[in-house]
Amino acid sequence: MKKLVLARVSTARKQADRKEDDFRYAVTGVSTHKHDSIEFSKGCDVLDYSIKTSHASLPSTLKGETIADKLADMYKRDAANKYVYISDDNVAYIMNKCEFTAFVLAFGRLERDSQKNGGNMKVRLLRESTRMLAWLNA
């Protein structure tokens, strides 16, 4: 796992958008970007990276009964090759699929999506904790 401290350059209103902009600036030198909602099987957040932040969720369209099943389905269809968790203090932890799987199994939970979004089970990351940061920095 690689670690990258990000400069705070974004002025986006949403936290997840700000962190994505800060990561984009660190890897491409470009900070402005129109945020869109692109299907995970058709594109990535930044280059070939999928960005996650505290309390993020994986796509609710994933098939499977367990977190491991849903991750396996995601990896079959995902356009991303690398996964990034950006901490509350703007540190990016860049992971491969194996590391990301271990991270999600340790710090993810299954929860039901809202009825307006179909009510399917989805994987949500827990809020950032000292235990999570210790795991990321080990």
Enumerate the predicted regions with their spans.
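Short beta-strand segments enriched in small/hydrophobic residues
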Residues: 2-10
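Nucleic-acid endonuclease domains
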Residues: 9, 16-138
